[in-house]
Amino acid sequence: MSYNLYISNSNVLSILIIFLVINIIFIFLKIFKKENTDYKFIYGMFRTKKLMEIMKKISNSKFSKFLSILSLILGPILITLAVFFLFFGILTRTPTYAPALPGISYGPITLPITQTIISIFIAAFIHEFAHGILVYKNNLDLKSWGFFYLGPLMGAFVEPDEKEIEKLNKKEQIKIYSTGAAINIIAGLIFLFLFFSSLYIISIFNLATPYVKILYTLPNTYAYNVIPNNTILYSINGNQILYLNQIEGVLNNTKPGEYILLNTSAGLFNIELTNKDNKPFIGIVTEQEYDYKVPGIDFIESLLFWLFVINVGLGIGNMIPIYPLDGGKTMKSILEIFLDKKESRIITLSLSIILLALILYNISFIL
């Protein structure tokens, strides 16, 4: 599969508008909360001690005990999964570690701008909040916590005393380092359940009509620069197209070099099929879309889906054993159970360098 990068002009404009709004927010924070705000135009950070009391209360609850046990169990499992997905991506030439950049299309997959930005912020918020809960559970304190932005992306952070964490026994260290990823996995599964629930509600009440959109055309094909971007595909050779798999069904009855008639919202197009892997290929990148009868329901459905994807992606990706990611810190604590600190540090550093090089190689598949 091709993973050509693509971003539309409208998405570029939307990203710039969001970036401008975030800048305005941080300018006001810099004016009224100067001592808590660091603002550098493309980067900003705001520290606060609000909500820390809530973290403390939760740290004394049964939920924190459950989260603590779950983190200890999931930590090593997520490290294993993170490494597995990296090697799986390399072996299959799939960019499993491609960055979640809003508005970017990786082949047929487009990350919606608003939903992606919201999902990244929520995933980062609950991730860091969970770290804070287990820090307090171990009777340690936080210097502060807050949120930041880098370009159009927003996230959250907590500032524990790392030296105090290193004084804890290795089991407690593993719990603290793994808990952010653990809560992301839990949240991701909850959002997945809500997503499928929304699909069920939409289907039983017939709240949406399916259709297929042509996002853009690919170079070295006869469709390139012939069919406009963001065109609705109605039919191929008279066969109605409502779902993506129907396109493949029609193409199975054709051969490379044959002409097909595409009926679209931009008019009729007689396109010659090219040969790709000995199969007929139109040269269009399509996306499944729905015409929703209730305003806003499509946004909610999309948001729930991307909340699932981003949370699970952050939960697994952050546990790749590369220092100073949580996975690297967790791996170091695990190694120190069996080895001395110097040996653990050397192994962790060596592993980090190797895995970082492999991740960069994996990401290169999108170029």
Where are these regions (language model features)?
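Hydrophobic transmembrane alpha-helices and their immediate loop junctions
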Residues: 1-367
